[in-house]
Amino acid sequence: MELNTGDVMRRLPAVDELLREPELEMLLAEHPRALVVAAVREVLQQWRETVRAEPERVPGSREELAAAIVQEVTITVRAKARPALRRVINATGVVLHTNLGRAVLSDKALRAVHEAAAHYSNLEFNLETGRRGSRYALVEDLLKLLTGTESCLVVNNNAAAVLLALSTLAAGREVIVSRGQLVEIGGSFRIPEVMKQSGARLVEVGATNKTHLRDYRDAITSETALLLHVHASNYRIVGFTHEVGLEELVALGREHGLPVMSDLGSGFLVDLSRFGYPYEPTVQETAGAGVDVVTFSGDKLLGGPQAGIIVGRREVVDRMKKNPLTRAVRVDKMTLAALEATLREYLDPEGALERIPTLRMLSVGAVVLAEKARRLAGLLGAALGDRAEVGVEEDFSQVGGGALPTAQPKTVLVTVRPKALSLTELTARLRAADPAVVGRVQEERLCLDPRTIAEDEFVLLTGTLDRVLGVPQ
């Protein structure tokens, strides 16, 4: 018998009628009325669409339909009541996971952010003179001390730092850069596009794999405003290659009265090569080569908040501070608080390796990782019992964040093979958990890398896996 859509539609209860249901009255006591009402209307609209498309799926009685709607509203309200930005246990082994928020802040940085957010502060107030101050002065002395430069400026990310530098130094004029350095920095943002937005004109020189000093020299004209060096922090070209050194580029710039800028991308303040990582130039070394401006990120290898950090010659950086664009890309008090606290950790470089989570995760030894894996596997094995096979095996982690692209630090994974649940269902349940858990899937197993799992997350992670494997859905 063909169902009459109008008759089925009339079975749908009104909003006010639903709000008088006992379950929804309880929801109204726990959550804002506007949230519950919005959820009711959303679910009702979904049922209207179901009636039009598949009326046979609608429960036969008005009472059954109301019960189904109430259940869906309850689920919807609880989902909407959760913060959109949620905690995630990063079990991927990717230390600077861009999609999971990159660097985890140090304890001191967290306390500094809380202090700045919870109270008024001297963000732009000079406590000595009683007059207006500069927010950039809050980290200037630290950055000058740590990098050996004359001045600094902090903006909201490194792309903004590059944009501001190009806009200030080369708007309407030419910037020379090696063809092999025209990088894409993530999210489809590319150096040529950033340059176009700044108003500067790109002049490519050399080939993808080889660029010589003569290529730069031959491209210099009266329209040239800047020589740009972009460090390949997120990729490597190997084999038949040649790149002009910074010292050579600086000498050429001075010969022609042109400033030289280096975009480091990630930006190190400590050398990690002693831990087996490929050599990368530090900010100090880059600035020491004589370049006029260096730009780098705050939330990558520095281990701080998202920020674009500009250091260099005072005359050049001061020009950037006066650019109207600076106001549009400036940082807030919480970023500056976190950055200052992070930079202070670097006054004790050895201590920074332990206190800054990013550096601690990158420098952790194989013995420590193996012990962490053994403890986590023991907890999981005891909790999951015969519901899953738990094991350990050697593998590799990743640095992430567009940094150290060829590095593959060794690790020891904890593997989980569920017996009564597909991996697709398991990973979906873990993503829906609170906190969510994100690992990697290899060879039909869930793999958990202890490099990026904090010790105090072991019990939480074990409990989450216990719940999702023990609840039939």
Swiss-Prot record:
Short name of one Pfam family: SelA
This protein's UniProt keywords: Cytoplasm, Protein biosynthesis, Pyridoxal phosphate, Selenium, Transferase
InterPro entries with a match to the protein in the record: PyrdxlP-dep_Trfase, PyrdxlP-dep_Trfase_major, SelA-like, SelA_trans, SelA_trans_N_dom
GO MF annotation list: L-seryl-tRNA(Sec) selenium transferase activity
Cofactor(s) listed: pyridoxal 5'-phosphate
EC number per UniProt: 2.9.1.1
Residues with PTM N6-(pyridoxal phosphate)lysine: K300
SUPFAM superfamilies in alphabetical order: PLP-dependent transferases (SSF53383)
Subcellular location: Cytoplasm
This protein's GO CC annotations: cytoplasm
GO BP field: conversion of seryl-tRNAsec to selenocys-tRNAsec; selenocysteine incorporation
Catalysis performed (reactions): L-seryl-tRNA(Sec) + selenophosphate + H(+) = L-selenocysteinyl-tRNA(Sec) + phosphate
Pathway info: Aminoacyl-tRNA biosynthesis; selenocysteinyl-tRNA(Sec) biosynthesis; selenocysteinyl-tRNA(Sec) from L-seryl-tRNA(Sec) (bacterial route): step 1/1
Function, as annotated: Converts seryl-tRNA(Sec) to selenocysteinyl-tRNA(Sec) required for selenoprotein biosynthesis.
Record-stated family: Belongs to the SelA family.
Protein name, as recorded: L-seryl-tRNA(Sec) selenium transferase
Source species of the chain: Desulforudis audaxviator (strain MP104C)
Lineage: Bacteria, Bacillati, Bacillota, Clostridia, Thermoanaerobacterales
